[in-house]
Amino acid sequence: MSPSLTWHDVIGQEKEQPYFKDTLAYVAAERRAGKTIYPPQKDIFNAFRLTELDQVKVVILGQDPYHGPNQAHGLSFSVLPGVPAPPSLGNIYKELVTDIPGFQRPNHGFLQSWAEQGVLLLNTVLTVEAGKAHSHANLGWETFTDKVIVALNEHREGVIFMLWGSHAQKKGRIINTERHYILKAPHPSPLSAHRGFLGCKHFSQANQLLQQQNQQPIDWQPKLPAVE
């Protein structure tokens, strides 16, 4: 793959498609009507801003954004600094403590340092109405994020997809397992984590796969940005 290929090159044309324009128009109309929509407009596409196409090493697929105040900021499972880690992220940390030597559970849930190392934290739906989980399902976001997975599938090799839960695993059916790696487990939600997410060792497995490809492993210890 040419390192010059960007998200803009491979999915930029989606912005011109009617389904995409309709999705953005719906979200804009909901905001104008006074509804609170998460994440803020400026953060919707943060995953792509922070992890460029040629930098992607790992994909962690989420469902839709957190729907509480100050949580969602465009990265799956991550919350803004100063907000307690939600239960699913708490279970991700619990798994990291047992899987990665020296991992210490952080006192925050801000995963931007993962994104900056090549972990694409992608939700399948990119907006949600406050307090209403899955309220923006089937608007058109799923079509867009399918195109993202197709682009990764076609233009990259050796990407590690972590697919947690049936929703992510269905979404991942299009991934070519001869070119990429798929790690599957139940969702880290408290409802299902004990069924095999805890103990899945996906984080150490991902680093082993990266090292086998002569790539830098991920430092899974989330770092807060230095205060200016």
UniProtKB/Swiss-Prot annotation:
Pfam families: UDG
Cleavable signal peptide: none
InterPro entries xref list: UDG_fam1, Ura-DNA_Glyclase_AS, Uracil-DNA_glycosylase-like, Uracil-DNA_glycosylase-like_sf
Enzyme Commission identifier(s): 3.2.2.27
SUPFAM superfamilies named among the record's database cross-references: Uracil-DNA glycosylase-like
GO molecular function: uracil DNA N-glycosylase activity
Alphabetic keyword roster: Cytoplasm, DNA damage, DNA repair, Hydrolase
GO cellular component: cytoplasm
List of catalytic residues: D64
Catalytic reactions of this protein: Hydrolyzes single-stranded DNA or mismatched double-stranded DNA and polynucleotides, releasing free uracil
Subcellular localization(s) per the UniProt record: Cytoplasm
One BP term from GO: base-excision repair, AP site formation via deaminated base removal
Function: Excises uracil residues from the DNA which can arise as a result of misincorporation of dUMP residues by DNA polymerase or due to deamination of cytosine.
Family: Belongs to the uracil-DNA glycosylase (UDG) superfamily. UNG family.
Full protein name: Uracil-DNA glycosylase
Organism: Yersinia pseudotuberculosis serotype O:1b (strain IP 31758)
